[in-house]
Amino acid sequence: MAIDLHIHSINSDGTDAVDEIVEKALEMELEAISITDHEYLTIPKKRDGIEIINGIEVSANWDTVEGSNVFAGIHLLIYFLEELSPITKHLENIRNLKIERNKEIIRKLNKENIKIEESELDK
């Protein structure tokens, strides 16, 4: 059984649209896939010939030595989420904070004469 349960689309840091991913998976004769975008629940349309498992990748940090302020980061893969689950609302808030952070970075770069438009973030 060939499966791929860790795929990113253009909704995250991947390069393919969701429909393209599903088409490629069918061409590769994968039996199951999960699109696990960062902090974004991508739910492709169901298709005959392939099982699509809802998934998401979430970033997390923890204090590796209690009280030391030394943190390690990990990415957690979560499967079988529903679109309206409580975690998806929380992750939407995280995405919005990241968007605002990126806009602030662009403003600071522009002040240093490194010209980047906010619209370039969507590419």
Regions found by a protein language model. Give the residues of each.
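Conserved acidic, metal-coordinating active-site core of Asp-based
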Residues: 123
